[in-house]
Every structure is written in structure tokens, then in C-alpha cells.
Amino acid sequence: MARVCDVTGKKPMVGNNVSHANNKTKRRFLPNLQYRRFWVESENRWVRLRVSSAALRLIDKNGIDSVLADLRARGQA
């Protein structure tokens, strides 16, 4: 299963671990993804999404109905 946010599309980034001696080794920065259930009043049901913490703030700001409408317009839900 891909580590991708359902709402924002955030994915893992690639960077470096840097030691005290300035040696660099590749690493992945993973997004902070959580499975959350959202109650959709208009559909009278729960919707389960894998969202980042940034997406949670976006849902708090715009509302779950608006976010789901955007997802459906993109063909992702």
C-alpha cells in the first residue's frame, strides 16, 4: 500500500541522514499519515480516509463535504 495522503497527495520525500562527520546516507522522509473516519452528514455514513496532519487541518477549515467533492471531481473517491 502506498504511503500517500488521500486528500493532499503528499508522498515520501528523499533526503540524507547527515552524521557529525558530515557523512551522508540516503533516507526517506515519510508523511504523517493517519487513518481517520469522518461522519458525512449529507450521506448519513462514515467515510474512512488515510490523511496527513495537514489534510486534517484542511478538512477542519473547509469541511468534509467540500473536501470529498474535490476528491470526487479528481476521480479519487
Curated annotation (Swiss-Prot):
Key words of the record: Ribonucleoprotein, Ribosomal protein
Domain of life according to the entry: Bacteria
CC terms in the record's Gene Ontology section: cytosolic large ribosomal subunit
SUPFAM superfamilies reported in the protein's UniProt record: L28p-like
Alphabetized GO MF terms: structural constituent of ribosome
Signal peptide, first to last residue: none
Single GO biological process annotation from the record: translation
Coiled-coil annotated spans: none
Family label: Belongs to the bacterial ribosomal protein bL28 family.
Protein's recorded name: Large ribosomal subunit protein bL28
Organism: Paracidovorax citrulli (strain AAC00-1) (Acidovorax citrulli)
